[in-house]
């Protein structure tokens, strides 16, 4: 089986061939943790979670290194902390926890590594120093360090923009200390009135903080090396963020290609406009959680449109996804005695024409709409079958395919939620939040807190099962 993926660098769909035939390295730009994620942010996470699942199918999860960073130092973070009158550390720590809770609600796997920018300042300083030494960057008297764009001849290779068009759209041309209007910042000096120690770091150019672009170059290099297979992110990151990443990384490591495949997902729109906090047209993941909407339905809504196309959020698209999830769950429930063991499901995949068609769709540039159509066809065939053995085999195929899409992470939600309401002191939403906090506690190696949360839920009749992919499922103990 071969995966074909659209490479923004070549503007073509290409057969994916990793640097190492037995392993894959993937870097995805993660959240800037100044506020809770809206569903436009979440769509990107779900897209690369699906890619991670497909790569795991092909190469084995143990052979995938999936790095997704946390940007925990940024102008937006500094301004938000001042607005709330709290420390930067408190803001970023609490927002990171909420991000993990929201992604758990959507059934997303944990990345292999999730580095924070502030933990890797030394790597950034080393790369900036190297760029200055090679003449690719320069420092100014006021403590700024800029990358000299004209020193990298392939600067526009990814974005395919012209410098003339960049001049017309430039926001930074008013900075007189820059040698060229397109030069971008690698290091910013600390503001004289900035008293938050979390925003100030020592450097050879004085106290300050890194620019946004250098953060991802440093973390991808530290955890994946000079060359890696896939770099992912939203289409809005093609320019300037990913364009600048390529420039500084390839100049810092002249023999490297940086990332081989550049993958970008489309915007999530509202009435044709990109969803963003600046336009105040956003819906947060928590807004949907508060409506007690199944996270699997939200995830399915994202996957119902091809990842490279814009997705317009509206009530109809969400209701359609909710109806499909209910249809799939009802289909599974209609088959008595279905074996849900993973081994049986995998064995069924090997010889099942329906699952072969489903997998083929995902291998064709993550064609999730076609994969969902295959899924519904399997469900339709289950309802038509009279023989219990045929129903069982098809249901195993349905379970396998649904698990690969990530829409069965809370299969028990509908049935168990009614039991929870009747027999427990916690709601399904509260259970999901506690599970996310427990996952965070385990990542922080706070084993006592993790055990306390498990015991708390158990005392309320909720049993937890930790899965190999880092997610946790729950069910009501009858």
Swiss-Prot record:
Co-factor note (free text): Binds 1 zinc ion per subunit.
Q: Which reaction does it catalyse?
A: tRNA(Cys) + L-cysteine + ATP = L-cysteinyl-tRNA(Cys) + AMP + diphosphate
User: Which coenzyme or cofactor does it need?
Assistant: Zn(2+)
The entry's Zn(2+)-binding residues are 29, 216, 241, 245
Which Pfam families does the annotation name? DALR_2 (PF09190), tRNA-synt_1e (PF01406)
EC number(s) per entry: 6.1.1.16
InterPro entries, alphabetically?
A: Cys-tRNA-ligase, Cys-tRNA-synt_Ia_DALR, Cys-tRNA/MSH_ligase, Rossmann-like_a/b/a_fold, tRNA-synt_1_cat_dom, tRNAsynth_Ia_anticodon-bd
GO terms, molecular function: ATP binding; cysteine-tRNA ligase activity; zinc ion binding
Predominant localisation class: cytoplasm
Q: List keywords of the entry alphabetically.
A: Aminoacyl-tRNA synthetase, ATP-binding, Cytoplasm, Ligase, Metal-binding, Nucleotide-binding, Protein biosynthesis, Zinc
Q: Where is this motif: 'HIGH' region?
A: 31-41
Q: Which GO terms describe its cellular component?
A: cytosol
Q: Where is the signal peptide?
A: none
- In its keyword annotation, does this UniProt entry include Zinc? yes
Residues forming the motif 'KMSKS' region are: 274-278
Which residues does the record give as ATP binding sites?
277
GO term, biological process aspect, one: cysteinyl-tRNA aminoacylation
Say which enzyme class the record assigns: ligase
Give the highest taxon in the source lineage: Bacteria
Q: Where does the record place it?
A: Cytoplasm
Subunit structure and binding partners: Monomer.
Q: Which family does it belong to?
A: Belongs to the class-I aminoacyl-tRNA synthetase family.
Task: Give the protein name, as stated in the record.
Answer: Cysteine--tRNA ligase
Organism of this sequence = Orientia tsutsugamushi (strain Ikeda)
Taxonomic lineage of the native organism: Bacteria, Pseudomonadati, Pseudomonadota, Alphaproteobacteria, Rickettsiales
């Amino acid at each position: 089986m071969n995966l074909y993926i659209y490479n923004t660098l070549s503007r073509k769909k290409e057969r994916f061939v990793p640097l190492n035939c037995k392993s894959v390295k993937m870097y995805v730009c993660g959240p800037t943790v100044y506020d809770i994620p809206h569903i436009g942010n979440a769509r990107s996470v779900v897209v690369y979670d699906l890619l991670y699942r497909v790569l795991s199918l092909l190469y084995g999860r143990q052979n995938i290194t999936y790095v997704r960073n946390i940007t925990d130092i940024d102008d937006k973070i500094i301004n938000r902390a001042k607005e709330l009158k709290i420390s930067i550390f408190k803001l970023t720590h609490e927002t990171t926890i909420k991000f993990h809770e929201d992604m758990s609600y959507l059934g997303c796997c944990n990345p292999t590594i999730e580095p924070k920018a502030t933990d890797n300042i030394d790597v950034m300083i080393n790369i900036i120093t190297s760029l200055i030494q090679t003449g690719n960057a320069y420092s100014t008297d006021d403590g700024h360090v800029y990358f000299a764009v004209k020193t990298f001849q392939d600067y526009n290779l990814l974005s395919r923009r012209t410098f003339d068009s960049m001049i017309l759209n430039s926001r930074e041309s008013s900075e007189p200390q820059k040698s060229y209007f397109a030069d971008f910042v690698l290091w910013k000096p600390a503001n004289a009135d900035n008293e938050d120690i979390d925003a100030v770091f020592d450097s050879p150019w004085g106290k300050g903080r890194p620019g946004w672009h250098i953060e991802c170059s440093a973390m991808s290099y530290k955890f994946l090396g000079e060359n890696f297979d896939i770099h992912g992110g939203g289409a809005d990151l093609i320019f300037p963020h990913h364009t600048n990443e390529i420039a500084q990384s390839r100049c810092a490591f002249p023999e490297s290609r940086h990332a081989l495949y550049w993958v970008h997902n489309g915007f999530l729109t509202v009435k044709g406009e990109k969803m963003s906090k600046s336009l105040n047209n956003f819906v947060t993941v928590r807004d949907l959680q508060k409506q007690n909407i199944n996270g699997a339905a939200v995830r399915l809504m994202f996957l119902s449109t091809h990842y490279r196309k814009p997705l317009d959020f509206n009530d109809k698209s969400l209701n359609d996804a909710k109806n499909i999830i209910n249809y799939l769950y009802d289909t599974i429930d209609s088959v008595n005695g279905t074996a849900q063991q993973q081994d049986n499901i995998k064995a069924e995949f090997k010889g099942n024409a329906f699952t072969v068609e489903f997998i083929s769709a995902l291998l064709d540039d993550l064609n999730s709409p076609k994969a969902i159509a295959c899924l519904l066809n399997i469900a339709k065939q289950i309802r038509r079958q009279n023989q219990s053995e045929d129903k069982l085999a098809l249901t195993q195929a349905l379970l396998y395919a649904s698990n690969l899409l990530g829409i069965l992470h809370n299969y028990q939600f509908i049935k168990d939620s009614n039991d929870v309401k009747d027999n427990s002191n916690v709601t399904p939403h509260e259970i999901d939040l506690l599970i996310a906090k427990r996952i965070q506690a385990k990542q922080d190696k706070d084993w006592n807190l993790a055990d306390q949360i498990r015991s708390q839920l158990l005392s309320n009749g909720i049993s937890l099962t930790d899965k190999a992919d880092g997610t946790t499922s729950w069910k009501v103990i009858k």
